[in-house]
Every structure is written in C-alpha cells, then in structure tokens.
Amino acid sequence: EGLIVIDKYTMILSANSSAWNLFHMDRVCQGESVYCLDREEEFRHAIEQVLSGEHTELVLKLNGSDIQLIANPVIRDKKTEGAVVLLVNVTEKLERESLRREFSANVSHELKTPLTSISGFAEIMQSGLVKCEDIPQFAGRIYKESQRLLQLVEDVIQISQLDEEKTPYTWEPVDVYQVCKNAFESLKEKAKRLNVHLYICGEYMKMEAVRTLLEEAVYNVCDNAIKYNRNDGSVSVFLTQTAQEIQIVVKDTGVGIPKEDQDRVFERFYRVDKSHSKEIGGTGLGLSIVKHAVGALKGSVILRSEEGNGTEICMKFPKVHKE
C-alpha cells in the first residue's frame, strides 16, 4: 500500500516507497506538488476534492494497473490543512471479480441449454402428442440432457473449490502409473465406442500429491484426448522421471488445435470447435480444471499441438511436496 501526506498547497510532505513504486517514480518527489506523480484530470480532480474537505475514493489507471485511491482531508480548526492519500493496487481483485461475473454468465448460459431441452421434451410428452413407441426415444433424450446437466454441475463445483483454495488437501505418496491406469479404466468404454486405442508407456513411480487433484488432471486430459480423436486413433500416456521431477505426457492422434486457439484452451468454457461442441459433449471446463489442479500440485502444464496432427499435453510435477 502506498501512503502520501500532502499539505493544503498540494506539496508532498511525506510518502513511503510503495507510493513511489506505484507511480513508477525513479526518484523521491518530496517537497514537490503531488501533481508531479500524475497529471491526468481524474487524479487532479480527486486532489482538489479532498483539499476542499471531502472524502474521496476512485480507481485510477496507472501504467496498466488499477490503483484504488482513498483520500481523507486533514482538518484543524474547521480548516483543511492537507490530506492523507492511500493507494492500493486492486488489479488482481478487479480481474477476479470480472472473471467471476463472466463465469456466472457462462454457467447460466450452459445450464439453460440442457434445461430448455429437458423442459421441451417433457412438455411434448405431457401433452400426449408422443406415440407410445416414441416414448423411449424422448426419454433417452431427456436422460442424455440430464447427464450433461449433472456433469456441468459437478465440474462447476470442482472448479469453484479449486478457485477458493480453502479445501484442506491431504498430501500423500501416490502411485502415478496406477492413477493413469485407473483413468484409462474409467474411460475405456468411451474409447471403445469412439474406436480409440489406449496405451501407457512407463514404469512404476511415486510422487507426493493430493490424490484427487492428480486423478482429476490425468482423467480430464485423457478424456479430451479421446473425445477429440479420429476413428481408429490412439491416446498414449508416457511416464518419465528424474531425481526431482515426474513427467506425464498425454499424446493423441486427434484433430489438433489451431495455433490461434492454443493460448485459450485452458480458459473456462472455451471450445475450439463451437459448432460441434454439443455433438462431442463435455462442459468446456475440463482443461480449466486441469490447469487449476496442476497448479495446486505446484506443477506446470505445456500444450503442443498442430492442426490435423494431434495434441500433446505435458504435465510436470515435483516428486516431493514443499510447504
């Protein structure tokens, strides 16, 4: 937090180093007018307002950052003798609020689609317009949309918990090979249905991790690799280790990701092929969950892809957890 004390003539009487840093000043401006820090009209108006005896608050744009200014007049014998100006960098806070609003809007939109379908099918059935032989088909559609809805709710809960970072995590030795094997076991029916072959290459290895987070990360990467693959394609997991690090690489033979989309695939609800997103399924939160889970495990994730030639996602983790 930056702190500046000025007199009634706008001269700087005192300021801390944080204040100079927030204004990107390479010198101390004590004894000069506070206007030397920022000559924008908004800042000038705030200073004039506080020196007229009014409490003032606003957010300034300084060098690409959002800085909250809180100014209080110093009053003696009913006269304003100066002011105390507090400066707080709120860039991260405002970004989080913006992301939260965007997330809420996206969740509402994503929930509306399956709910509208379920409501529509149920209304047609209730009206008696459906032939008896068509009822299983309509019921199947309702079931499919309800499963999509459940998956979305589960993913939203998962990513909200990761965002809050309040969940007490239990770190323990985890068999990485077994985690990958379990993910393939859970996905084998989907892979079989889409005619995608699954392979694990590596050896038994352990790392200190939060088991549920590692399982979420591996499962979601493998799930995406299967969904966006081609007929008779494959998904291969390669496990390697060094003295300090575990590396999990998931490589597929799928459609690949265009270069212009590669920086955005870890964003919430971002889908590369929006026209086929409903057909392929999923909530658009899978890779966002991966990013959060890997980050919580103090790891890193790297994506390499070429449109038409598959995708490779590399997750690196430290073997030993350090507080």
Residue locations for each model-derived region?
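Short alpha-helical segment of the dimerization/phosphotransfer core of two-component systems
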Residues: 144-149
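Short acidic helix/loop segment immediately C-terminal to the autophosphorylated histidine
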Residues: 126-133
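Conserved glycine-rich
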Residues: 298-299
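Short conserved segment of the HATPase_c
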Residues: 257-271, 291
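Short conserved segments within the C-terminal catalytic ATPase subdomain
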Residues: 190-200, 204-205
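Conserved micro-motifs of the catalytic ATP-binding
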Residues: 164-169, 202, 206-209
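PAS-family sensory/regulatory modules and their coupling/dimerization elements
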Residues: 30-92
